[in-house]
Amino acid sequence: MTEQAAVLLIFLFVGHFLGDFTPLATARMLEAKLTGSPIGPIALHALVHAVLVGLAVAAIARPVPMLILAAVSVEFWTHLGLDWVKGKMSVRRPGLGDPGQSIFWTALGIDQFAHALVLVGIAFLALM
């Protein structure tokens, strides 16, 4: 792995942390993610992540507009889809929304792993 790839991955993962685990994820966004609706706050949450990805790619990879747009689009749509599906699944299986249940932690791990795979893919494509 090149130094550039390592730095880009670090920026992408720090951005993911900031988007999910700081005040950038508002109470309204978090509430909507619990049930998968309304979609607006989930889309806004995905947009926050997409902007952070765009900034990382522009800063570390290449400031090529089409590359940045592609990275932002991939992040927005995959983040929106993953969070929406997880919310809808939580309605059908209430344990997914309860930190006291082991299934909650399994689902959180799968969710975060899926988001990480998307970020690795974005880094790969950005540095091709």
Q: Which role does the model predict for each range below?
A:
Residues 1-128:
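Hydrophobic alpha-helical transmembrane segments
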